[in-house]
Each structure stands twice: as structure tokens, then as C-alpha cells.
Amino acid sequence: MLISDRDIRRHLDSGRVRLEPSDPAMVQPASVDVRLDRWFRLFDNHKYAHIDPEQEQPELTRLVEVAPDEPFVLHPGEFVLGATYEKVTLPDDIAARLEGKSSLGRLGLLTHSTAGFIDPGFSGHVTLELSNMATLPIKLWPGSKVGQLCFFQLSSPTEHPYGSGAYGNRYQGQRGPTASRSHLNFHRTVIE
């Protein structure tokens, strides 16, 4: 069940859901707006011939920090990783989903490619998968609204929350945009 503004405020006030820093003005009818941090992870395409999710490729991306009053310019067709300014901490019975802001989507900005789901038990800054689908560069300002979190009440607490280790916890506690760690649990079924 999608959680309403009333229940979002109740969970934030009680500390069951934590957003740090928290700003009550960010609460919307059924979501909470999140803001863009100052760090971006750019792809160094010349380091590898291809991307292989099975292999660790530590030099695939590099971290870039912009000044608080300086925008990051995302060019047409470019893909970078960003992060939410807010650290998000969820209990074992609430999941979240990151959605883009419609005003930014109408400018051609995608905030996530596929990874919008946030498991119960997660704690950390949410990595954003930022793409510019427009034909002009887009300025991304640190501290500006970049997305929104919708919260879902589970039917019961999960047996193994994210971070417990049972299902993996590769991104627990992440700070800033975190590169893929797919090699740590790569699975491939042999299909004949």
C-alpha cells in the first residue's frame, strides 16, 4: 500500500523512516522530494573495451565534485551517476521507490535507468542514474529537487532486511554515487 503524506510525516516524526537532513517542506501528497548532492561519477570510456557486469572494473568511473553554487552540466546522450543529498534509512516493513520529477522529465532528464526500488532495511544515499535525453545540455544544481521517494507498507516485516547479509548488502551505507558492484553477486544461468 502506498503511504500518504499524513503517514509519511508520522513515520518521519517517529524516526521509523529517516531522511537526513529532513525538511518537512519536501513532503508531497504521497511522496517526499529528494535533492541532488554535489558528487557525480563519470564514465571513463577509454579505460575498457566494453563493460562486463561479471568483472570488477575499478577504473570504469571517476568521482567528480562540484562546488555548492556551481552546476554540473549533463550533455545530450550523456549518462552519469549522481546521489541524493538525503541519507535514507528504512525499517524492515517499509520499501521505497525513487521516481523522477515530472518538471525535469519534461526537460529530458531521467533520474534512474532501472534501479528505482529501495529495499526495506536499506540505509544510505540513493545513487541516481542520470541521463539527458534532450538535445541541449541540462544544468544540474546541487541542492535542487531531482526526484521523489514513494513509500510502501509491506504486508509484514521482511524476514531478512537489506543489510542483514542474507540477500546481499553491497550498497548498504553508501555515501555519494556508488559504482556498480554487480561482480560481487553475478549470476548467469546456462541456457541450452
Curated annotation (Swiss-Prot):
Any GO BP: dUMP biosynthetic process
Location of the active site: 129
Polar residues compositional bias, start-end: 171-183
EC class (word): hydrolase
Pathway in which this enzyme or protein is active: Pyrimidine metabolism; dUMP biosynthesis; dUMP from dCTP: step 1/1
Catalytic activity, as annotated: dCTP + 2 H2O = dUMP + NH4(+) + diphosphate
EC number: 3.5.4.30
Residues involved in dCTP binding: 101-106, 119, 127-129, 148, 162, 174
A single MF term (Gene Ontology): dCTP deaminase activity
Site keyed Important for bifunctional activity: positions: 116-117
The entry's keywords: Hydrolase, Nucleotide metabolism, Nucleotide-binding
Region (Disordered): 165-184
HAMAP family cross-referenced by the UniProt entry: dCTP_deaminase (MF_00146)
Function recorded in the entry: Bifunctional enzyme that catalyzes both the deamination of dCTP to dUTP and the hydrolysis of dUTP to dUMP without releasing the toxic dUTP intermediate.
Subunit structure: Homotrimer.
Family of the protein in this entry: Belongs to the dCTP deaminase family.
Name assigned to this protein: dCTP deaminase, dUMP-forming
Species name: Kocuria rhizophila (strain ATCC 9341 / DSM 348 / NBRC 103217 / DC2201)
